[in-house]
Amino acid sequence: MDTLFRLVSLQAASEQQQQQQQSASYNSRSTTSSGSRSSSHQTNASYSYYHHSSNSGGGGGGGGGYYYGGQQPPPSQYYYLEPYQEECGNAPHHQLYMDEDFSSSSSSRHFHHGAPVQQQQPPASSTPTGTAPTPPLSTSSTAAGAGHGLFEAADLSFPPDLNLDFSSPASSSGGGTASSGAVGGGGGGRWASQLLLECARSVAARDSQRVQQLMWMLNELASPYGDVEQKLASYFLQGLFARLTASGQRTLRTLAAASDRNTSFDSTRRTALRFQELSPWSSFGHVAANGAILESFLEVAAAASSETQRFHILDLSNTFCTQWPTLLEALATRSADETPHLSITTVVSAAPSAPTAAVQRVMREIGQRMEKFARLMGVPFRFRAVHHSGDLAELDLDALDLREGGATTALAVNCVNSLRGVVPGRARRRDAFAASLRRLDPRVVTVVEEEADLVASDPDASSATEEGGDTEAAFLKVFGEGLRFFSAYMDSLEESFPKTSNERLALERGAGRAIVDLVSCPASESMERRETAASWARRMRSAGFSPVAFSEDVADDVRSLLRRYREGWSMREAGTDDSAAGAGVFLAWKEQPLVWASAWRP
């Protein structure tokens, strides 16, 4: 079973169970399973139950669409875990989750429509991934101690009020909202959103029995190697589990350490290039931002005297510099006279607890390659990487020495998916950071952010709490919007990448870490609190910036870029009546705006 929690390894137990099952009938297995559940309810200890689907238990009854609604699941094997608090509350974190290997433990199939559906298997990777040890399997119950307060022993049958439709695949084209997929409706195959939203409501209401039932169901259906719905269930369930056990930061440290062990320059390069090749998600912002920066620099060069021009880009983006080769080439070919000097200072931000050794190795290699490419293009070039740990608002911009060429140096600030790295708080930190960018007096500031409303209201408002409004209502609002956004992202990867792809798996794991951060961490600690274009535009205007419309040449470049990709991607300009009030352009997937690109000047 591709179980999300990875609390117990079922490999050895499965082999032993298979030998015992050869002489057992279908009914005897059902009776045994029911008896195990019944006997467990008579103990005083709290146990967490995890269901292991048997391929021989296939079914679900009848033809047509397969619904979970009031009927018992197929015959299956049940395993006892140690008392919940002992395993989940006090166990070392590497026992709660297998790092990022997510290797299948015993079953690789789920049953939809009463028939097995083969899941996507993890691709063979040239970079080995470690496997954390798992706690021992307990074959008998004990009555020692009370369990975790959130999970009391409960009947793990399917709740009778759930009516989930698996008859059609999920699609993000409908533009779902936070309230879509209400439990009880058909849902058009969006069973993950239905179950996850209901589970989030139960978590907010502290309904421990229903939480346990729903998490058991989700654990049965989730898989990081399945379809979009199974992946959403897998990653959001991991986030919910970390939230319930107050282990969000610990979980992120474990996932980050696993990613760090398996990160190299080659793997990073392959993933970035493959992502750009098959999806415009990142290259859309790169093309728009480069166009605005280049036009700004060329304006300076045209109006300047004969002295050598110096341009400096402050890159506040963790894009591994994939944006800059095309800009270097454009500077070399479009400069009328002497090629200007270009300096790039890139700030690589990371969470305080995240390992940075692998990223530092990658950035050293990137810097060497960038300098070599600039020499080939004939562009005088200087590259510097600054590694920053923690909140981007704590970065001392004045210490970066951005005017090494004196007052004649033209400065551009590039912010690609970086402003959300400023953690919301009571001191209006995001507004303050935008104001600090204004004090640099740049020629242009490019802002590219993913379009999602993942803050409760205005986390920087004076009336907000230090946690950014972490109430039950705020949690549900952010959870629902996160489902919408990451569903569209996963759907775009599903339709753009091959079924088996190491690069796609790496991107999905990155999204999984973002989901865990969003769901399990309070707003005051989360690095994934995206905002809408309207919010960012308001902040930039308040800081003293005015929007710069992209020229028709830049817009044509973006449209030409999108024609290289599969159908479903489109560009939408922000009109004057738009939420962004005429600032920038949007990248849309199946009519859903997902990425916003804009340019600003003082």
Curated annotation (Swiss-Prot):
Region feature Disordered, mapped onto this chain: 12-69, 101-145, 165-185
Residue numbers covered by motif VHIID: 311-315
Pfam families tied to this protein: GRAS
InterPro entries per record: TF_GRAS (IPR005202)
Location of the region described as Leucine repeat II (LRII) in the Swiss-Prot/TrEMBL record: 365-401
GO CC annotation, single: nucleus
Location relative to the cell: Nucleus
Region (PFYRE) residue spans: 411-517
Low complexity composition bias: residue spans: 12-55, 103-145
Ranges annotated as biased composition (Gly residues): 56-68, 173-185
Stretches for region VHIID: 272-349
Residue ranges, annotated region (SAW): 520-601
Residue ranges constituting the GRAS domain according to the UniProt record: 183-601
Alphabetical UniProt keywords: Developmental protein, Nucleus, Transcription, Transcription regulation
Functional summary from the UniProt entry: Transcription factor required for the asymmetric cell division involved in radial pattern formation in roots. Essential for both cell division and cell specification.
Subunit comment: Interacts with SCR1.
Protein name as it appears in the record: Protein SHORT-ROOT 1
